[in-house]
Amino acid sequence: MKVGQLVVLVDEVDGLEAGREGCIMGVRDDMLTVGCQTSERLHLVLAHTWQVLPRELFRRLSAREGREL
């Protein structure tokens, strides 16, 4: 994963629900700083690498399971 990559949270992280899209703002070891926009403001959350998926992979997996995004 790299800075600027679009990702989707697959777990609830710091009060933001799973399925929320964000952009990687920073990477350090197995931790990511992810910026997620809500209607009120930009939330920066600290997530483990296993708590997010690249957006395109998430969409492909969701389509395979028959879910609409």
Question: What are these model-derived regions, one by one?
Answer:
Residues V3-R59, A63-G66:
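Basic/aromatic-rich interaction segments and small domains that mediate binding to polyanionic partners
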